[in-house]
C-alpha cells in the first residue's frame, strides 16, 4: 500500500472441515458481511438512542454484541463454552461469566437461549474432582443458572414447546430445587448456604446474592 492508502481485509477463524462455511464466506466481500452483521443486531435490538446520554446507548448495544462474541460454537451449531473463562474441554470452568453472557439471549435470541439452557443443565453443577466434592452447594448460584435462564426465557417468550420436548430438563430443575429446599433445618431462616459464589469463597453463614438467585 502507498502512504495513507487503506484497504479492508477479511479474516476468518474457521474449521477446515467445514469447507461449506469457508466457501460461503469467500463468496462475498468484507462490506457485505459487515452489513449483514449490523443488520442482524439491528433486528434484535433496534437502534437505541438516549438523548441525555448518547454514549450510554452505544455502550449498551456494544455490550450486547460482546456477549454474542463470547460464545464458541461447534460445527454442529452447538455451544462449546464461552471465552470469558469457560470451556468445558478444560478442568477450569467459570460458569458465572458464561451465565452473564447468556442473559441478553433471554430477551432477543430464543434459539440461542435454548442452547444455553441445555448447556447449563449439563455443566451448571460442579462435578466431583480431586479437590472438591462438587454438587449443588459447591456454588448454589451456578447450580441455579439453568432454572433462572429457563424462567427468564419462559417469562419473556411464553413458549412451552421447548420444555415439553425436553422432559428431563424439568425433572432436573425440580430435583435441584428439592435438594435446596430440603437442606434447610427446621429452626433456620428461609435462607440457603453455598460454599462458593463462583470462583471465590462465599463468606458468612448466608450469601446475599446467592439467596437472591434462589428466590428469583
Predicted regions and their residues:
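Acidic/polar, glycine-enriched structural segments that form the non-catalytic walls/loops
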Residues: 1-91, 161
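Generic preference for hydrophobic/aromatic residues in regular secondary structure cores
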Residues: 11-13, 20, 67, 130-132, ...
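Generic, low-specificity signal for short hydrophobic/alpha-helical stretches with a mild N-terminal bias
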Residues: 26, 45, 83, 95-102, ...
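Secondary-structure junction/capping motif
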Residues: 29, 168, 172-175, 195-200
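Tryptophan-centered motif/residue detector
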Residues: 33, 41, 94, 185, ...
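Glycine- and aromatic-rich loop/turn segments at beta-sheet edges
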Residues: 69-87, 122-136, 181-203
Amino acid at each position: 500500500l502507498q502512504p495513507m492508502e487503506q484497504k479492508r481485509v477479511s479474516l476468518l477463524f474457521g474449521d477446515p472441515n467445514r469447507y461449506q462455511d469457508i466457501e460461503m464466506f469467500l463468496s462475498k466481500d468484507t462490506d457485505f458481511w459487515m452489513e449483514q452483521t449490523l443488520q442482524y443486531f439491528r433486528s434484535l435490538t433496534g437502534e437505541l438512542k438516549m438523548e441525555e446520554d448518547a454514549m450510554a446507548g452505544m455502550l449498551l448495544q456494544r455490550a450486547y454484541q460482546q456477549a454474542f462474541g463470547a460464545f464458541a460454537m461447534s460445527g454442529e451449531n452447538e455451544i462449546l463454552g464461552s471465552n470469558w473463562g469457560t470451556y468445558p474441554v478444560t478442568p477450569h470452568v467459570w460458569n458465572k461469566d458464561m451465565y452473564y453472557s447468556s442473559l441478553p439471549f433471554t430477551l432477543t435470541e430464543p434459539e440461542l437461549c435454548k442452547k444455553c439452557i441445555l448447556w447449563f443443565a449439563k455443566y451448571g453443577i460442579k462435578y466431583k474432582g480431586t479437590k472438591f466434592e462438587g454438587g449443588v452447594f459447591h456454588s448454589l448460584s451456578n447450580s441455579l443458572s439453568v432454572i433462572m435462564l429457563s424462567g427468564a426465557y419462559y417469562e419473556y417468550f411464553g413458549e412451552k414447546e421447548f420444555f415439553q420436548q425436553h422432559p428431563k430438563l424439568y425433572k432436573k430443575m425440580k430435583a435441584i430445587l428439592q435438594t435446596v429446599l430440603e437442606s434447610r433445618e427446621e429452626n433456620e431462616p428461609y435462607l440457603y448456604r453455598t460454599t462458593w459464589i463462583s470462583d471465590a469463597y462465599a463468606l458468612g453463614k448466608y450469601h446475599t446474592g446467592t439467596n437472591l438467585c434462589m428466590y428469583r
